[in-house]
Amino acid sequence: MNFACAPRVCSWLLFGLLAGNLASAQILSDPADWKESDVPPPPAYDMSKLLTFEVTRSSPLVYGVDPASFSISKTDGIVRYVVVATTPAGAKNVIYEGLRCSTGEVRTYARAKPDGSWVTVANSEWKSAYDISLPRHSLRFAKAAACLQAAPVSSVRELIRKLKNPSVE
């Protein structure tokens, strides 16, 4: 039996199936009494030490994360980090985020101002990294390095190794 569809339609159908399966598997594995631990303040970051990663081939933005900002909480399973999105003109958007690998969710804790100080995001909530209305960098970072299926990677060292060697698996 042959099945044909427009490439864009097929890719969206496949994305929906994969995202739905992964999301349902992750939700089932999350404890009902889960509670996020106290969020550490935004860490310092160094623009000269960013490890870049590709989000989409068509994106004009360059995304990078500072490995010194990485933390993996053993109590709540959250991977926290500072991500920097840079435009072709050099403008930067610096964000302090957390990834919840067990549910495929992301939360923005703070954004950096041009002077380097942080502004806490009021009423920040966990949102699906698969939500197509959100920027894709969190999902790509989770898949490329931060999460191993529905769990965070074992260590910051492992996270850095995966970012530096994306094809080694």
PLM region spans:
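N-terminal secretory signal peptides that target proteins for export/translocation
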Residues: 1-7
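Short, solvent-exposed aromatic-acidic interface loops
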Residues: 86, 110-117
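Secreted/processed peptides and extracellular or luminal domains of membrane proteins
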Residues: 29, 40, 107, 151-154
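Bacterial N-terminal signal peptides
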Residues: 10-21
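C-terminal partner/receptor-binding element of secreted or periplasmic proteins
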Residues: 119-169
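A short, surface-exposed beta-strand/turn
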Residues: 95-105
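N-terminal secretory signal peptides
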Residues: 26-96
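Short hydrophobic/aromatic-rich beta-strand segments that constitute the beta-sheet cores
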Residues: 81, 106-110
